[in-house]
């Protein structure tokens, strides 16, 4: 199914970005994160439409410190500055507060408007942060052709992909129920995504 393939791609992106030597997302940053969104292959939506579109996964930190099962999300719009010749980028968003994650669950959430976003620090540990990074609620990591690209994501809209959630978790499934653990069978690739987050952010 397309949804399981999306989860497999998200695992691949997260793993590759975390394992990038000296250029990965600092583990101590993920340890403090309240939510993580991974959008593999965010693509240009055409010159006429402008902006971009992509589908990904979002997991939030449960009260006991573990990661929840992921909800499916979409990411659209925004005047993302794609470099010449680049058709798609992989995006990871690290939420530093619960507020932003709750906003996505409650409705549409616009990066830069509903919460400040800045290109996140890379390396083994997040030490020297810029003013923009210190103020940002969300750190973004974007990658094109395997290389990091500090692409601005302001104006991009994150929303829950209800159709995908219901296709995977069953009818009437809401993101709140997914995040609270009130789901029965979770397909393997989604479990692998959750496990990958646990592995890279063990507290």
Predicted feature descriptions by range:
Residues 1-203:
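Small-residue-enriched, tightly packed secondary-structure blocks
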């Amino acid at each position: 199914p397309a949804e399981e393939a999306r989860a497999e791609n998200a695992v691949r992106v997260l793993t590759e970005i975390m394992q990038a030597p000296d250029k990965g997302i600092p583990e101590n940053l993920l340890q403090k994160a309240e939510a993580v969104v991974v959008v593999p292959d965010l693509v240009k939506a055409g010159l006429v439409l402008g902006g971009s579109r992509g589908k990904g996964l979002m997991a939030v930190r449960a009260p006991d410190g573990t990661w929840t099962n992921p909800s499916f999300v979409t990411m659209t719009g925004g005047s993302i500055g794609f470099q010449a010749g680049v058709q798609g980028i992989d995006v990871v968003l690290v939420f530093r507060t619960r507020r932003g994650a709750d906003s996505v669950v409650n409705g549409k959430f616009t990066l830069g408007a509903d919460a400040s976003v800045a290109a996140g620090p890379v390396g083994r540990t997040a030490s020297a942060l810029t003013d923009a990074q210190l103020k940002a609620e969300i750190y973004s990591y974007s990658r094109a052709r395997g290389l990091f690209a500090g692409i601005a994501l302001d104006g991009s809209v994150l929303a829950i992909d209800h159709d995908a959630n219901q296709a995977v978790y069953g009818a009437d499934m809401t993101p709140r129920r997914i995040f609270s653990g009130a789901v029965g069978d979770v397909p393997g690739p989604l479990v692998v995504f959750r496990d990958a987050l646990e592995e890279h952010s063990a507290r």
